[in-house]
Curated annotation (Swiss-Prot):
One of its GO terms (molecular function) is DNA-binding transcription factor activity. It is found in: Nucleus. The keyword rRNA-binding does not apply. It comes from Trichoderma arundinaceum. GO terms for biological process: positive regulation of transcription by RNA polymerase II. GO terms for cellular component: nucleus. InterPro entries: Fun_TF. PANTHER family: TRANSCRIPTION FACTOR, PUTATIVE-RELATED (PTHR37534:SF26), TRANSCRIPTIONAL ACTIVATOR PROTEIN UGA3 (PTHR37534). Belongs to the TRI10 transcription regulator family. Pfam families: Fungal_trans_2 (PF11951). The gene is TRI10. This is Trichothecene biosynthesis transcription regulator TRI10.
Length: 422
């Protein structure tokens, strides 16, 4: 993109701010030892206008969050620029999607990766505690790309671009540096981007299930998760696939249960059988994830929180149930083992589920954890927003023990727009 020099300087500065400050906040558990590290990232961010503008708006959102109260004049300027870039990102995204209708081959694959990248940046923007916007619209757009992303991954698997080394640079040959070389396959950078963004889409999608309930496209996310070698959540969010799959299965069980209830044909035998199968997977995984590595600890936190989710789907959102109390207590034990409590800021989903089902004696632990984690009201992630969700839920505790609310989405979002627990 050719821009006036002064504009270009400011935008490059914002891009670097994103790389240095925002990306690590979005993905603090991103494992850099694996293929591609972040060597593909700048290529994708600067590749097309939608991705570029969405990233700049996200960078300004973070800068705005870091301002002090006495910097109101500067905040107003940044807010205007933030919204300008955001609107540009929306406009360019629509044009990009329209252009995909006439694209084909490698150009279409790259276009789909660009579309996914810009969509996920817009979800991060809209779902932030600073925006509280319509992230569902963008998530639906991202989900619609799943079939073509899987096709792209199948093509990549047939090429030599899915490297086994720790850096894509060890696999390059002279043709990769030849400017006149016609591309007949995705480059290493684009394969790395495809894999990364597909994992992020799966993560957002699975987390959204508890926020929006049965309207979630469970089968599409399951289809994505089942792609061999593509989804490796531990590399992105520190949690292994089996725990995230279990969360997805619990959401699917919740949908099935509601449909059966609506049709007055719910079989408690079938419900128990399905729930026990999921519980067995979680308990088996927890036994295997008993190591000292951080990925084992993070995975276990998600798994014990998933047990709480499962018990509430089966028996209702009642914090007085013994099985709920056991899984909540188990999660608290694991949270106390975090080597750095600041990591808790990135565990919004397990904190949301576990905290809502906490007992009165456990309330102060969760309040203190948010403070110790360094969460603030003005942050990209929704960790601070959990405080209101918890407090509102705790006020209803006595009512919940007598007549539990039937839907998690009512607890998570209250009367406001759905909250993405990430």
């Amino acid at each position: 993109m050719i821009l006036p020099k002064r504009t270009q300087e400011k935008e490059i500065s914002l891009l670097m701010h994103y790389l240095d400050e925002v990306f690590p906040l979005q993905f603090p558990f991103h494992e850099r030892r694996y293929v591609g590290k972040r060597e593909w990232l700048l290529t994708i961010l600067a590749s097309t206008r939608p991705v570029y503008y969405a990233t700049l708006s996200l960078s300004l959102l973070h800068k705005e969050a870091c301002l002090h109260e006495f910097e109101a004049e500067l905040a107003e300027i940044w807010q205007k620029e933030k919204m300008r870039y955001y609107i540009l990102a929306l406009q360019e995204s629509q044009q990009q999607l329209d252009a995909l209708d006439t694209a084909y081959g490698i150009a279409k694959m790259k276009g789909n990766i660009h579309a996914l990248a810009s969509t996920l940046q817009l979800i991060s923007f809209e779902s932030s505690s600073l925006s509280k916007g319509d992230w569902q619209l963008h998530l639906r757009a991202g989900t619609s790309l799943i079939p073509v992303l899987i096709d792209g991954w199948a093509v990549a698997l047939k090429s030599d671009k899915v490297a086994s080394s720790s850096s894509l640079w060890t696999e390059l040959d002279a043709s990769d540096f030849n400017a006149t070389h016609d591309e007949d396959s995705l480059s290493y950078e684009y394969v790395g981007a495809l894999k990364f963004f597909a994992n992020v889409l799966a993560m957002f999608g699975i987390f959204s299930c508890i926020s929006i309930g049965p309207s979630s496209p469970f089968m599409e996310y399951r289809f994505l998760m089942d792609q061999a070698g593509l989804i490796q959540m531990d590399q992105i969010m520190g949690c292994r696939n089996w725990a995230m799959l279990a969360i997805l299965e619990i959401g699917t069980l919740d949908k099935w249960k509601r449909e059966e209830q609506e049709n007055r044909r719910l079989s408690l035998k079938a419900l128990t059988s399905r729930a026990m199968a999921i519980e067995g997977v979680l308990e088996s995984g927890l036994r295997e994830a008993s190591g000292s590595a951080l990925v084992d600890l993070i995975t276990s936190i998600y798994a014990t929180s998933a047990l709480t989710y499962l018990h509430t789907v089966v028996s209702g959102l009642n914090p007085n149930l013994s099985e709920v109390q056991e899984s909540v207590a188990a999660t608290i034990v694991l949270l106390k083992r975090l080597p750095d409590l600041r990591a808790a800021k990135s565990l919004v989903w397990p904190l949301g589920v576990t905290g809502c089902m906490a007992s009165r004696s456990q309330e102060d632990f969760f309040r203190g954890l948010i403070i110790s984690a360094g969460a603030t009201p003005r942050a990209l992630r929704n960790c601070w927003g959990l405080m209101k969700v918890w407090e509102d839920t705790w006020k209803m505790r006595e009512y919940m023990s007598k007549q539990p609310p039937e839907r998690w989405e009512e607890v998570v979002s209250g009367q406001g727009p759905p909250m993405l627990l990430m």
